[in-house]
Structure formats: structure tokens, C-alpha cells
Regions:
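Core transmembrane alpha-helical segments of multi-pass membrane transporters/permeases
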Residues: 136-170, 181-196, 200
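Juxtamembrane and boundary regions of transmembrane helices in multi-pass small-molecule transporters
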Residues: 1-5, 11-22, 26-84, 92, ...
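Small-residue-rich segments of transmembrane alpha-helices in multi-pass membrane proteins
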Residues: 6-8, 77-82, 145-160, 213-223, ...
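Flexible hinge motifs at transmembrane-helix junctions and intramembrane kinks/re-entrant loops
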Residues: 57-61, 86-91, 99-141
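Helical membrane-embedded segments and adjacent short helical loop/helix-boundary regions
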Residues: 44-48, 84-93, 113-118, 138-154, ...
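Hydrophobic alpha-helical transmembrane segments in multi-pass integral membrane proteins
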Residues: 100-103, 153-171, 223, 227, ...
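Short helix-coil transition sites and intra-membrane helix breaks within transmembrane domains
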Residues: 9-19, 114, 159-166, 197-210, ...
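Hydrophobic alpha-helical transmembrane segments of multi-pass integral membrane proteins
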Residues: 179-222, 226, 233-234
């Protein structure tokens, strides 16, 4: 359940998962849908919250844990006692984090504030306050991998957009692809495929970079609602990783603890991925209609 919850919360906010930025870049360039941090949260937080209610309950029923009763209060009190009072560095980090969230949300109410600038200022404060040292930054290889690869992929995406590659591909598919079904059915089919195909990918970034532009282009060529389709794929990008224990980076770490066998994990993952997919449409479409994002 710990892993399953992380895959749901990963799509609820733009900053919840690093590949979300890349996914939004593709969605914006191919469908025209662009969102601020607050708009993303408004659109996807409610479907995510509903999933957070049902997914752990179903997961508990599918793979019941050996320990069903624990003294939460005592464990929390013991853990808090071990941590001790908040250090000054932790207080500074908490304030910086809250201010960064506010900064990312401000553009949605008319403030001309770059999310990148907010992130850089927050990182600079954290660095000069000594919360993160240069050695910490150098030794965190995953961060540098993300920085380099995301920069390269975003640059390639921009170049393809300027060359009108995605527009050409959409026009070509529209002229040669015959899908005699309604646009909503196309969204259902493509989003389901986007979840199933995650069995072939051990990285959200790899999936987004290689498959998301294809799904987006096929969908646009079929006349789908760009806003609905973009929102759906932004969500399936994350919870599609439910299907396997290697669908995202936390999976192998949690699986290696030895609490679950492969059969139970994959069974629970498949069932919960389907449940999440259903809840996305059952909750998402009425919610997006209510807030005026789709007609």
C-alpha cells in the first residue's frame, strides 16, 4: 500500500514527481493544454483524494497484512521522542517549502512569477542556509541524472515542436487512421493502453519520453477533447506504475524489503491500476465539467 499510495499522490500535484514537468511539456505542445501549479492541483487533486480512500482499502483486502492492529499513538510518540525538537535548519526548510508552494500557486491568480525562478530561489536559500551542502548535491547522482536527461529531452521536444513535427504527425494520422468510434471511446482505449503498456517500462521518465507523444498525437488525430485527454494521460503517467514492482523508482526499494511476493504484488497492482483508471473517469469527468475545464 505504501508504494501504491506514492503512485497516486505522484499525479496530484505538478511538483509531486519529477517527470510531471516533462509530461506537461509534451501535453502543452501537442494538445495546447497548459496549466499552472494551482490549476494542475485543482484538476487532479480531487480524483487523487478519492483514489486515496479506495485504493488502500482494496489493497488491504487483496493482500491482508500479518499485523492488523498496531498502537499508532505509541509508535508516533516514540518516533517523535527519538527525533527530538525541530532544529533551526528544519524550521527554515519548512518555511522555504511553504513559501515555494505559495510561489508556484501565485501565477494562477495573475502574478507573473516563473516557477523555475521560485525553485531556484528556494534552492539557493536552502544551500546558503547550510541545510544542503555542496557534497550532498554532488553525491546525489539521481538529481544530476534527472537534470541532464530532462534538459536534453525538453530541448528535443522544443526542437520537434518548432519543426512542426507533432503537427505533421497528427495531420498524417488523421488522414490515414480510421477510428470509427466516439472521441470519448478513443480516450478510454488509449488511456487503458497507456496503463497496460507500463509492464514494459521500468521508468516513468522513459515511458513519458517514448510513448506519451505517440498517445497524444493519436488522440488529437482522432478528435478527442484536448483538455480531457491531456488530464487523463497526466494521471495515467503516474498510476500506470502500479502494475509492477519496477514501475517507478520506489518500487524495487520497497519490494526488496521482502514483505511481499511477486504474485501478490502484481495481482494487487493490476487490480488497483484498473480501479484507479475507473475512478479517474467516474470522478474526473464530472469534476472537470463542474470547474469549467471541459464542456
Amino acid at each position: 500500500n505504501g508504494y501504491f499510495v506514492t503512485k497516486i499522490t505522484s499525479f496530484m500535484f505538478l511538483t509531486a514527481m519529477a517527470p510531471n514537468v516533462l509530461a506537461l511539456d509534451f501535453v502543452t505542445k501537442i494538445t495546447g493544454l497548459n496549466m499552472t501549479w494551482a490549476e494542475w492541483a485543482l484538476a487532479l487533486a480531487l480524483p487523487g483524494l478519492v483514489m486515496l480512500i479506495f485504493v488502500p482499502l482494496v489493497g488491504y483486502w487483496i493482500d491482508r497484512p500479518e499485523a492488523v492492529k498496531i498502537d499508532n499513538k505509541k509508535l508516533a510518540a516514540d518516533g517523535l521522542a527519538k527525533l527530538g525538537p525541530m532544529k533551526m535548519s528544519e524550521k527554515i526548510l519548512a518555511v522555504v517549502f511553504i513559501l515555494a508552494l505559495i510561489g508556484w500557486a501565485l501565477p494562477s491568480i495573475g502574478f507573473d512569477l516563473s516557477p523555475t525562478a521560485v525553485a531556484l530561489v528556494a534552492m539557493t536559500i536552502v544551500f546558503f542556509a547550510g541545510i544542503i551542502t555542496w557534497d550532498d548535491m554532488v553525491q546525489t547522482k539521481a538529481v544530476w541524472n534527472t537534470f541532464i536527461w530532462f534538459g536534453a529531452i525538453l530541448g528535443l521536444s522544443t526542437a520537434l515542436t518548432k519543426a512542426k513535427f507533432f503537427a505533421w504527425l497528427a495531420a498524417y494520422m488523421q488522414a490515414n487512421l480510421a477510428l470509427d468510434v466516439s472521441p470519448l471511446v478513443v480516450v478510454l482505449i488509449l488511456s487503458a493502453i497507456s496503463v497496460v503498456i507500463r509492464y514494459l517500462f521500468a521508468s516513468s521518465t522513459a515511458y513519458i519520453a517514448s510513448m506519451l507523444p505517440v498517445f497524444l498525437t493519436v488522440g488529437m488525430a482522432s478528435g478527442v477533447d484536448p483538455v480531457m485527454f491531456g488530464l487523463v494521460l497526466l494521471a495515467t503517467n503516474a498510476f500506470g506504475g502500479l502494475v509492477t514492482h519496477y514501475g517507478a523508482s520506489p518500487g524495487p526499494i520497497i519490494y526488496s524489503a521482502g514483505y511481499n511476493n511477486l504474485k501478490d504484488w502484481w495481482t494487487a497492482g493490476a487490480i488497483l491500476a484498473v480501479l484507479s483508471w475507473v475512478l479517474l473517469f467516474v470522478v474526473g469527468i464530472p469534476w472537470w465539467t463542474f470547474i469549467g475545464m471541459i464542456g
